[in-house]
Regions:
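Cytosolic, long alpha-helical scaffolding segments
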Residues: 2, 6-222
């Protein structure tokens, strides 16, 4: 057998190698799609809470985007189950996927309360929380895109920003709860508003969880 024939790689092995890289790519591609959907959903949420003209349609559209994000989660789970080599640690992919999905779930849960509780009046504190969530979602998206480009150290700047935004949300929660108990006399209205404020703050905690997961990825791979 000639030397060039013995060293040639069979086409089947080449195809397997190509498939492997495609499977590696799907994790980053799907994470980018999750981040894109999250930004779209949070911006829609912010627009919705500043209007509230049709809370039923608002809640329905948010549920659709939450379901879209769930599909991305299922895609990643399916690929993890059949892929041996992944671009980063499997547990990091799973943790990042879960934390992104938690943010989306939190925003959708808040949106659903507007329909459930028949809230049709704008609230300045909810608007401020929504602004924090929009800025957080953009920080998450920027960090995810850096991750998929393997630019790990620049991700840290966005992680720090996410931590700062979560601190702002903590401060805002204290202010709005204080204002709520000082000014709202209707106990039912107080309960409704308080739950939404707290859910919004918890959603910023989920954004911080994304940052913590990204920090872990930086440490593992730097």
């Amino acid at each position: 057998m000639r030397r060039d024939e013995s060293s040639a790689i069979p086409n089947s092995q080449v195809d397997k190698g190509i498939d492997m890289f495609k499977k590696k790519d799907i994790f980053f591609k799907t994470l980018e799609e999750m981040a894109d959907t999250l930004v779209k959903a949070v911006e829609y949420f912010a627009d919705g809470v500043s209007n509230l003209s049709d809370v039923k349609a608002f809640a329905k559209r948010m549920k659709e985007m939450e379901s879209e994000c769930d599909q991305y989660t299922h895609t990643i789970l399916k690929e993890l189950n059949k892929t041996f080599i992944t671009p980063i640690e499997r547990e990091d992919i799973m943790a990042l996927t879960t934390s992104l999905d938690d943010v989306m779930d939190g925003v959708e849960a808040c949106a659903s309360r507007f329909e459930m509780y028949h809230i049709k009046e704008k609230d300045e504190y909810i608007t401020l929380f929504a602004d924090i969530l929009v800025r957080s979602a953009h920080q998450i998206k920027s960090a995810i895109y850096l991750l998929t480009q393997k630019k790990l150290l620049p991700m840290r700047e966005h992680c720090i920003s996410l931590n700062e935004l979560e601190n702002q949300a903590d401060d805002l929660l204290r202010v709005c709860i204080s204002s709520l108990f000082a000014n709202v006399k209707d106990p039912i209205e107080l309960i409704k508003r308080k739950e939404i404020y707290e859910r919004l703050e918890q959603t910023t905690d989920c954004c911080e969880d994304v940052a913590n997961t990204l920090e872990s990825i930086i440490m593992r791979n730097s």
